């Protein structure tokens, strides 16, 4: 049902703990920003104290800044009102707060204390706090008032133990995502291990948290569980649990009602409930399409043309963010650039989440002692139906080795993009796609290399360029030697100072441009081999003539003609309902140079 390996395992470790008779049962942190300048923080706190009263107890809190210095505090008595007491600390304003974002995940620390009538501390709890806003503003998805592009992936929990993922493996996941320019993760299709949320808070990943609801086996028509109110309690219970469990995590910027479960009264009610309790995050649901119960149009696997058709509609007010796209199965992700040409040039098209992060396969040993990756069909009696390798559609292998197409994701998702606008003096136009980072946090390394692999020039530059701005950088004229037909300008960017997940030696972005050498004659270059003669176009490298004993053998110049075998995505319909046909395929783009 969830496009994941259907294996059993211990899903999580259960923590057991005891509390005093009177205890802190729940708390909700409200850490947002004022919406005039998005500079000052607004802090509020709601606390629920459970259990029978023990005299006049009190609840106090301290909020410490990222350096550990207290910046806010408060204390209120717990009035005896039965077995549950609700306490609200009034909102307070913090000037020029350190804001949280995926680029700069600044965290404050909240410490909550419950004291008995004698002033003795009986319980201490708390969490990390991030000041940020997440909203739909003028039809665009914004963090801290700034429109952002979702450079995302979907992530199932998978390891060689099944669905149980160790802390070390989660740390490896987030490190790889940060290294490969991913800024968003969708928890597909269920809330995940609590440690994953803490990692995303601390190291900076936007998170789409998703309720554990999927029933696409029932279809989207009249039989859909979404339309049967008998199932409302089940839908509502899973939505409640998702929200209450994770409501205090700043990394969660969008709630998702579920996945591929149809749409109807049950999802309308869960949407209504979430909007009633949640004022600081949008809510999305893919199967709602353009019905009222979604704040984001998040249809999966829409083509570039379908995105353009949506944007051409009148009076649209939802951003288009694909919850799944460019199915990363086998040799794949080749169409990513075409999507991002649209996202970078249309304000209300704001990215999406690749399906998906990790291959759900298992390492096995064959009869010859050699290891291999197993998948559906490798287990159980022969003839048992399976989905084959359909769950091997990750950007990384099951042991977290990056697949080649993760490099394509890194390149397209990179936040620094350059255009060569003057080949004579090597002037480069730099676009800063970061939302909250100046490019002076990075170093530009450049070099000019000839087609003989000799280094002709190199240097480093610091570029001052604000988020979403452009800057023109002139590197200087580099003369190519006469024996060099063409040179290559290589641009590479690294961090000036290391981040916890990204070192100063890691290339975060690169570009390459061809520099023409001295233009030679366009006359044909003749050559002979015995009684055979041929001519080659010096500009294009095309074979224009081939003669044998003076007789021309070519009717036309030879042109490149290539085709590829079918990929996993070409053949991925596992029921054979849509046989692959190649008769419609044509060359997308051709070019030639020598």
Outline where the language-model segments fall:
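Secreted/periplasmic carbohydrate-active enzymes, especially glycoside hydrolases
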Residues: 5-10, 15-199, 203-207, 238, ...
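Substrate-binding/catalytic cleft of secreted carbohydrate-active enzymes
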Residues: 171-177, 184-397
């Amino acid at each position: 049902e969830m496009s994941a390996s259907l294996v059993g395992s211990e899903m999580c470790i259960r923590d057991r703990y005891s509390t005093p008779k009177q205890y802190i049962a729940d708390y909700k942190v409200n850490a947002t920003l004022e919406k005039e300048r998005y500079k000052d923080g607004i802090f509020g706190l709601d606390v629920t104290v459970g259990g029978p009263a023990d005299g006049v107890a009190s609840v106090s809190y301290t909020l410490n800044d990222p350096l550990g210095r207290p910046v806010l505090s408060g204390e209120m008595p717990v009035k005896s009102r039965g077995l549950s007491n609700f306490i609200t600390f009034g909102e307070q304003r913090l000037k020029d707060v350190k804001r949280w974002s995926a680029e700069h995940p600044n965290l404050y620390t909240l410490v909550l204390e419950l004291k008995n009538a004698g002033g003795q501390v009986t319980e201490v709890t708390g969490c990390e706090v991030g000041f940020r806003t997440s909203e739909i503003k003028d039809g665009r998805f914004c963090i801290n008032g700034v429109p952002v592009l979702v450079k995302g992936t979907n992530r199932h929990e998978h390891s060689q133990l099944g669905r149980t993922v160790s802390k070390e493996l989660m740390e490896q996941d987030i490190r790889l995502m940060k290294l490969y320019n991913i800024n968003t993760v969708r928890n597909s299709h269920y809330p995940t291990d609590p440690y994953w949320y803490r990692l995303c808070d601390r190291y900076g990943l936007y998170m789409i948290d998703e309720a554990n609801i999927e029933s696409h086996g029932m279809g989207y028509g009249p039989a859909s569980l979404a339309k049967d109110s008998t199932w409302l309690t089940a839908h509502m219970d899973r939505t409640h649990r998702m929200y209450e469990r994770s409501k205090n995590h700043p990394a969660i910027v969008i709630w998702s009602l579920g996945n591929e479960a149809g749409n109807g009264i049950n999802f309308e009610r869960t949407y209504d409930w979430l909007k009633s309790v949640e004022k600081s995050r949008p809510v999305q649901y893919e199967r709602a399409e353009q019905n009222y119960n979604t704040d984001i149009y998040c249809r999966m696997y829409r083509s570039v043309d379908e995105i353009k058709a949506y944007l051409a509609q009148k009076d649209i007010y939802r951003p288009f963010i694909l919850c799944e796209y460019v199915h990363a199965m086998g040799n794949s992700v080749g169409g990513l650039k075409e999507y991002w040409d649209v996202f970078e040039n249309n304000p209300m098209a704001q990215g999406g989440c690749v399906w998906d992060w990790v291959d759900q396969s298992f390492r096995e040993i064959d009869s010859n002692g050699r290891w291999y990756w197993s998948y559906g069909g490798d287990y159980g009696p022969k003839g048992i139906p399976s989905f084959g390798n359909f769950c091997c559609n990750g950007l990384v292998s099951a042991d977290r080795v990056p697949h080649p197409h993760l490099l394509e994701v890194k390149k397209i998702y990179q936040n620094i993009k350059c255009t060569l606008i003057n080949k004579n003096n090597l002037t480069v136009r730099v676009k800063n796609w970061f939302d909250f980072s100046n490019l002076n946090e990075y170093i530009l390394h450049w070099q000019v290399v000839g087609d003989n692999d000799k280094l002709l020039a190199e240097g480093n530059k610091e570029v001052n360029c604000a988020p979403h701005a452009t800057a023109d950088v002139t590197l200087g004229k580099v003369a190519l030697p006469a024996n060099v037909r063409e040179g290559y300008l290589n641009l590479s960017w690294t961090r000036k100072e290391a981040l916890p997940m990204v070192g100063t030696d890691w290339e975060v972005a690169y570009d390459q441009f061809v520099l023409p050498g001295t233009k030679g004659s366009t006359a044909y270059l003749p050559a002979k081999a015995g009684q055979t003669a041929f001519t080659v176009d010096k500009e294009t490298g095309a074979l224009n003539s081939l003669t044998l004993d003076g007789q021309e053998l070519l009717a036309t110049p030879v042109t490149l003609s290539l085709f590829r075998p079918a990929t996993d995505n070409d053949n991925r319909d596992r029921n054979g309902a849509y046989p692959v046909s190649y008769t419609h395929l044509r060359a997308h783009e051709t070019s030639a140079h020598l």
